[in-house]
Amino acid sequence: MSNDYSKLLGKITEKFGTQAKFANALGISERSVSLKLNNKISWKDSEIAKAIEVLEIDPENIPAYFFKYKVQQE
């Protein structure tokens, strides 16, 4: 099962404009961000913590950004 990062991507665009600027704020490569958003590699706990900080995500909303599963359409 894969995660739905559409809300996270919207927040990245709102705060940073591009994935590259967001990646720079996290201290990782743009490719790493892309792979994470496309469920190719997992987020490390430290990266999630940093993303929450730089995106100013309210702690109660964290699950909606990082732990929402994609729903399969039948």
Residue ranges and their predicted role:
Residues 1-3, 30:
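Short, Lys/Arg-enriched anionic-surface-contact patches
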Residues 7-8, 50:
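Pre-recognition alpha-helix immediately N-terminal to the DNA-recognition helix
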Residues 40-46:
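Short, solvent-exposed alpha-helical "recognition" segments
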Residues 46-62:
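DNA major-groove recognition helix of helix-turn-helix/homeodomain DNA-binding modules
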